[in-house]
Amino acid sequence: TVCEVLKEQNCLHQGETPYQIQLRTFEAMKRDMFPYLTDPDVFEVPVGSIEFVEAYLRKMYGIEKMVPLLVPIQLDIPEYLGRKDALVSSKSELREKASEWGAEEIFLKSASQLKCDYTGVYDIRKDTLPSDKEMYISEVLNIFSEWRVFVFNERIVGVKHYLGDPWVMPDKSVVYQMVREYTDCPAAYTLDVAVAADLYSGKSSTVVIEVHPFVS
């Protein structure tokens, strides 16, 4: 199995980095287990962690890395956001934007990599703010429940509860409207939505959190 191959490679090459082991493992799998991968007419879908998928795409197709989709421009409107958001490139710019919003806390994540170790809510008055060249920030929402919507060829194929109260469900018509309006999209993606208190009206509404490549 793939797990057995990975364990064997980890054991045989303990002095190498995980990335080097991944590349060596792919070569072994390609040669011994999946010789048909050399056939250009065959397309395989890697299943695993983001790190695994990125290493696979890099090795097999020369794709260096996947870029976060964040909130696509077609969905980045007040009707769907329920909050303010922005892209910033420094701590000073981050603080300026938060001050403009009148916010003492902001949600922050990387705008250049799918997974990072600093995603979270930060108090802008403290010195613990991370520093990065490309960061996505937004006002902090009061979220009651969060859901992941699976979309393939612009059609919803599944919905999964993600966080919060599973009995607080998103507005079906709003979710379908988001999918219809997000036309500049990949063939397959996931749409994270939440039921949250609107920061301005206080009313509960269905909002977009972010969009991910389908590997998420």
Could you describe each region identified by the protein language model?
Residues 1-183:
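Active-site nucleotide/adenylate-binding loops and adjacent lid/helix of ATP-dependent enzymes
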